[in-house]
């Protein structure tokens, strides 16, 4: 029997890098990752068939890809030795070959007899080495129109036992189907062969490219269960997909990173950059900086886009000095920062710095020949709106026009968002007037901001009028629109209208996302409609949407507020069992729920679990704990929490002192209330109405006591 030589392994796309993190104190071996379908195939490619006729494909066999010298050599070899056009003509003799994976294939079993034409074909191709079949299939799959023909070739090869590396052929097909957004067909095809590392990797890549992260992660887990190691390229694709679809969060990324470490995968440059950017995009610049330092220590220069993403994350976190330092590092490396890099730093100045810093940044851009874009101007408008300088914001609009940057709906949406965040929702009408005067037509994003503005300030009639106007202009609402409307109706107690909006959303073909379900779960919980809430959770899971941290936090909150503490604890345990880490917000909700019912012991236990999970106690959690002791008439323990706060660098706020005064009043220790009030003032807290009311109540009772004596 002729043994066909397997194609050589292709090297990774980038230079390799392996991190030794502080978790490991010994060296690891370098592991070569399993090959993936698209990197394992020989790089030669054949011309794709024209959609109009199959004959054009047969006549264009000579037109091989000439991008690489070795491609030319290999394709010339193919041309000299083998002509596949008779086979392709035979398979397409009844017309264009359609991709029919869900039907029973006629060629699965080896035939007992053949017609003379097919017999001659089989004999003529019996000696073709496997790499040439790989090249043929890769060529056919380069065009969607010839995917059916590619599958027909693979089926024909199996039928006649002409190739002994079908897993690679199937991997090429699966990869091509994923690239053509035919994920369903890719899964059907994968079922026709036992999954191997090659086909696993191809299928995971197809899922990631189609943003079906849940399936990709499930396949990686199943692959590991079967004793195979995932390809590092797949992790890159998964992280890129999460980043691209804005679904990435630090907890999920950390879990993926630990998997990579545990599997001792060799990290390539692309994966390192993807991980760093992923942490930055997920709002965890500290982890991104840590990994950047590790990468630079190995001599790796991060991509400009990676550095800009960290600068942006630092700016979002208000860490402007660190963002400045990284921006300067970018400049000193010889790279001329472009508009996007300046915008990332400008965002930090708008968020935390004085207005002059934002203005000087824009001036510096212009001096260095970097043209401001609409995002630059919108950030500067944000800065002026934050400073209450509406006229200056209008001047920026005029500057945009003078600089040939036409103000668009996005700029006006930022202007409106600034007024919304400052509580000046009445200026909405002024913005609309200004927008109309220069001929800018509102788009979906602008309408979403308008609806959100009206919803936040309980102007629900205005919100619905805006929604109707949006529809009348032919602008289809997106998930943000529906979520905003549903949420604002829920928050103002209009649960029936919210439910109607949820149903209308589905009727119009807009599929609810995790955020939508979380809003409705909270609505049902507030109404104590537990059966409806569980039904909705089931529906959410049936649609492939996994409950996230917000879902579990919402469940803990609504269960806790209703005294269903066993259900709340069950949610916490379920969350941990699926690898999600409970957040401080979740424990705050549980502690507060116990506090409202005076269950101080349970509140303390929840607090202990919180700290044992590695979460730093927040001011909110500690205030809730003080409230729990106060409700349980345990004022000594309440003041012990205050002492704990002082010793651990948590600054008490007005809520802390007000809650302590309430605890003293509850146990009739009125004479101590003025002392707490005075300490509050001395600590720099400004008393609010509730604090002053507590003091008056205590003084009034003390006065009555003196009179009675």
UniProtKB/Swiss-Prot annotation:
First and last residue of the signal peptide: none
Molecular-function GO term, any one: mRNA binding
Subcellular compartments: Plastid, Chloroplast stroma; Plastid, Chloroplast thylakoid; Plastid, Chloroplast
BP-aspect Gene Ontology terms: chloroplast mRNA processing; chloroplast organization; regulation of translation
Keywords noted in UniProt: Chloroplast, mRNA processing, Plastid, Repeat, RNA-binding, Thylakoid, Transit peptide, Translation regulation
Domain of life: Eukaryota
The keyword Protease is annotated on this UniProt entry: no
UniProt keyword Metal-binding, yes or no: no
Transit peptide start-stop: 1-54
PPR repeats: 196-230, 231-267, 268-302, 303-337, 338-372, 373-407, 408-442, 443-477, 478-512, 513-547, 548-582, 583-617, 618-652, 653-687
GO CC annotation: chloroplast; chloroplast nucleoid; chloroplast stroma; chloroplast thylakoid; thylakoid membrane
Deleted gene: phenotype: Seedling lethality under normal growth conditions.
Family: Belongs to the PPR family. P subfamily.
Known partners and oligomeric status: Interacts with PDE338.
Xref: PANTHER family: OS03G0856100 PROTEIN, PENTATRICOPEPTIDE REPEAT-CONTAINING PROTEIN
UniProt function note: Required for chloroplast protein synthesis and accumulation of subunits of the thylakoid protein complexes. Activates psaC and petA translation by binding their 5'-UTRs. Required for the correct processing of petB and petD mRNAs. Interacts with the petB and petD intergenic region and is required for the generation of petB and petD monocistronic RNAs.
UniProt-recorded name of the protein: Pentatricopeptide repeat-containing protein At5g42310, chloroplastic
């Amino acid at each position: 029997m002729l043994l066909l030589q397997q194609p050589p392994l292709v090297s990774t796309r980038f230079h390799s890098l392996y991190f030794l993190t502080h978790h490991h104190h010994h060296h690891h071996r370098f592991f070569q990752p399993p090959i993936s379908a698209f990197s394992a195939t020989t790089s030669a490619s054949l011309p794709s068939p024209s959609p109009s006729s199959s004959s054009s494909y047969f006549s264009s066999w000579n037109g091989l890809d000439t991008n690489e010298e070795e491609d030319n050599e290999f394709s010339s070899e193919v041309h000299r030795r083998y002509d596949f056009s008779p086979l392709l003509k035979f398979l397409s003799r009844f017309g264009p070959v359609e991709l029919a994976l869900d039907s029973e294939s006629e060629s699965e079993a080896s035939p007992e007899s053949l017609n003379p034409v097919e017999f001659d074909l089989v004999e003529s191709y019996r000696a073709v080495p496997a790499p040439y079949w790989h090249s043929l299939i890769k060529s056919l799959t380069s065009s969607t129109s010839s995917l059916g023909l590619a599958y027909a070739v693979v089926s024909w090869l199996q039928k006649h036992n002409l190739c002994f590396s079908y897993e690679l052929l199937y991997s090429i097909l699966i990869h091509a189907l994923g690239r053509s957004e035919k994920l369903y067909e890719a899964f059907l095809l994968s079922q026709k062969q036992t999954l191997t590392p090659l086909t696993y990797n191809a299928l995971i890549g197809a899922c990631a490219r189609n943003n079906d992260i849940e399936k990709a992660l499930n396949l990686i887990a199943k692959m590991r269960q079967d004793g195979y190691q995932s390809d590092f390229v797949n992790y890159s694709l998964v992280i890129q997909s999460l980043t691209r679809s804005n679904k990435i969060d630090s907890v999920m990324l950390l879990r993926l990173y630990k998997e990579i470490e545990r599997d001792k995968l060799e990290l390539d440059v692309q994966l390192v950059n993807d991980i760093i950017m992923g942490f930055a995009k997920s709002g965890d610049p500290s982890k991104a900086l840590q990994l950047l330092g590790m990468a630079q220590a190995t001599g790796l220069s991060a991509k400009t886009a990676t550095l800009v993403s960290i600068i942006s994350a630092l700016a979002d976190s208000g860490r402007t000095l660190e963002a400045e330092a990284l921006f300067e590092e970018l400049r000193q490396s010889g790279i001329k920062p472009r508009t996007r890099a300046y915008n990332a730093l400008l965002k930090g100045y708008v968020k935390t710095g004085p207005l002059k810093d934002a203005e000087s940044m824009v001036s510096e851009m212009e001096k260095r020949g970097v043209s401001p874009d609409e995002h630059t101007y919108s950030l500067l408008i944000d800065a002026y709106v934050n400073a209450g300088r509406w006229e200056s914001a209008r001047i920026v609009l005029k500057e945009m026009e003078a600089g040939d940057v036409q103000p668009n709906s996005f700029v006006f949406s930022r202007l409106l968002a600034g007024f919304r965040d400052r509580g000046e929702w009445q200026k909405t009408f002024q913005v609309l007037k200004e927008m109309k005067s220069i001929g800018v037509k509102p788009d979906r994003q602008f309408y979403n901001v308008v609806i959100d503005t009206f919803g936040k300030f309980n102007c629900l009639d205005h919100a619905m009028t805006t929604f109707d106007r949006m529809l009348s202009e032919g602008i289809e609402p997106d998930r943000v629109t529906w979520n905003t409307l549903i949420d604002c109706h829920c928050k103002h107690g209009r649960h029936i209208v919210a439910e109607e909006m949820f149903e209308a959303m589905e009727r119009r073909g807009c599929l609810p996302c995790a955020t939508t379900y979380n809003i409705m779960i909270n609505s049902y919980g507030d109404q104590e409609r537990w059966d409806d809430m569980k039904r909705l959770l089931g529906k959410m899971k049936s649609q492939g949407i996994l409950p996230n941290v917000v879902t579990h936090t919402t469940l803990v909150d609504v269960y806790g507020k209703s005294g269903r503490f066993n259900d709340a604890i069950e949610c916490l345990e379920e969350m941990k069992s699926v690898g999600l880490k409970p957040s401080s917000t979740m424990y705050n909700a549980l502690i507060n729920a116990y506090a409202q019912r005076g269950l101080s012991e349970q509140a303390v236990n929840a607090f202990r679990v919180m700290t044992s999970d590695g979460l730093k106690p927040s001011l909110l959690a500690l205030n809730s704990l003080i409230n729990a002791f106060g409700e349980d008439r345990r004022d000594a323990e309440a003041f012990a929490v205050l002492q704990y706060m002082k010793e651990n660098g948590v600054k008490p706020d007005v809520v802390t002192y007000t809650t302590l005064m309430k605890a003293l009043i509850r146990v009739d220790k009125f004479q101590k209330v003025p002392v707490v009030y005075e300490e509050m003032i001395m600590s720099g807290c400004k008393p609010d109405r509730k604090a002053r009311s507590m003091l008056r109540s205590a003084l009034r009772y003390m006065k009555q006591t003196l009179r009675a004596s």
